[in-house]
Amino acid sequence: MTLLRSEAPAARRKKVLFAGEIAGWDSWGRIFQDIGLFKPLIQEICRIHSLPFSEPEHLTPGTNAVFAVGEMVFKIYAPAEAGFDQSADCDTEIFAMQRSRKAGVSVPEVIATGILHDRYDFRYLVQSRCPGKAFREIWPMPDHTKTVPAAVSGTVPAAADSVGYSPDPAKTAFARSLRRLLAPLNTPCEIFNNIDVILDPERGKRWDPFPEDFREDRLRIIAGLCETVWKPESFVFVHGDLNEDNILIDGNRISLLDFGDACLAPIEYEYALAATELFRLDKAFLQGFFPEYYDRAAARLLDELADLITRGILIHDFGGDVLRQRFGLCESLHSTEMLRDFIRSRL
C-alpha cells in the first residue's frame, strides 16, 4: 500500500483503547455505531494527525463505523475478526475519490488515513464533511412494497400512469444534472481492486430468496451477455452505490459520498441502481437521467431502456435486495422477462 502524505505509519502501543469484542459479523453489527467504544480510537487518530477533536456524532449507518467529528468524518473499517475484512474498501475509496476529484466532481477531501494496531487492527479514513442535504431529505421516496407485488403475479400494469406519475421539473432537472456529473466518471479506468461484478459467487447470494426458475433464468441471461456484450475491456468506472444517502445537494452543487463499492463494471451497473434504488422508477427522474430514451416519443426506445435497467439490476451486488426491499418483488418473479415487463410498465 502506498502511503499518502497524510497517512501515519502503523505503530503498536501497549495501551488497549478498544474495549469491544469482535467475533464475527453479528458482533460487529451490534457495536459499530457505539460512540463510547470508538471514541478512544477517534481521539488517538486525532492525536496522531494533530486534528481537532470534538464529541463524535452519529451519521447514517452503513457497513463500517462512521462518525462526524466537527467538520470531519471518521470512518473506521471492520477488521478481519468481523469475518469480512473491509480494509480493502479504504484503498478503493481513496483511489475513487482522487479520480473523481480530478474529474471535477465534488467529493470529500482525504485528510488522513492509516492503521491503528490496538486490540484489533483498525484501518481508518478521515475525510472532510461535505455541505448539503442528502437526497432523501429533499425527495423522500415512497414505499412501493405495499402496492407493487400484485402487479407481477399475473398481469402487469399497462402504463406508468397507473402508478401515479406526474411531471416534476425539479426532479427532472436534478436527474439531468446527476447524469452530466457522472459522465466523466463512468469512463474506462485502470484496474484498482479485485471486484468481479459478473463471476464472484459471493455477489449472487442476495438472489437466494428468489424462486429457483428465476435464479436459473438470471444466470442464463448473464452467461449470454458475457459471451456477446459484456467484455472486461469495455467496463467503466462506477460509483456502485448511488443511493439516497450517498448524494448531497447544496444549491446547484451535487456531492458524491461513500465510494467503497466503486468498481469496474458495465455502464448498466451504475444506471440500473440509480433508476431503481435512487429514483424508485419515478418517471420524472427517469426523464432527466435518460433523456436519450424519452426525448423522442418512441415505444421502441423505452423497450431498450427497460432492457438496460433489467440487465444492470441482474448483475448488481445489491440488485436482489433492491427488488425485495424497494418494490416487494421476490416470490412472484419466475423469469427475467417478468422483471423486465414490470420495469417497462413503470417507464
Residue ranges of model-derived segments:
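Juxta-kinase regulatory segment immediately upstream of eukaryotic protein kinase catalytic domains
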Residues: 2-53
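Active-site acidic catalytic loop and adjacent metal/ATP-binding pocket
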Residues: 62-70, 220-271
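An alpha-helical support segment within catalytic cores of ATP-dependent transferases
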Residues: 33-49, 115-118, 148, 156, ...
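ATP-binding pocket architecture of kinase catalytic cores
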Residues: 56-192
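Active-site activation/catalytic loop segments of kinase-like enzymes and analogous catalytic loops
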Residues: 268-298, 310-342
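Short glycine/proline-enriched coil/turn segments at helix->beta-strand junctions
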Residues: 51-52, 69-72, 103-106, 250-253, ...
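Short, flexible/disordered intra-domain loops and linkers
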Residues: 26-31, 80-89, 321-333
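Short beta-strand segments
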Residues: 75-76, 112, 237-240, 256-258, ...
